[in-house]
Amino acid sequence: MKVKVVYLGVVRHKVGRKEEEYEVSEGSSLKDLLTKIVEAHIALKDLAGSLNDSQIDPTLIATLNGFAVNLNSSRNVILKDGDTLTLMTVIGGG
């Protein structure tokens, strides 16, 4: 299965690209994909935190096909062929 990943803001800056496509196995979870992304882009490790402990930085937010997803529950989200994951950080200021 192919899943498109779009990077915005700080995440795009750390990754160095706008988007890319990942090949994942049937039945893969969002956690599986996040692990692949961090392995490919070690600069995201600070935001992804410890994926094994589900302690992802709360400033990292994601949408899957345009709907918000809780990254700390990523092992419960099963991906489908053609999904689009968007990763970004919270924008703040004042």
Identify the role of each PLM range.
Residues M1-G93:
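Ubiquitin-like/PB1-type beta-grasp interaction modules and other compact soluble beta-rich domains
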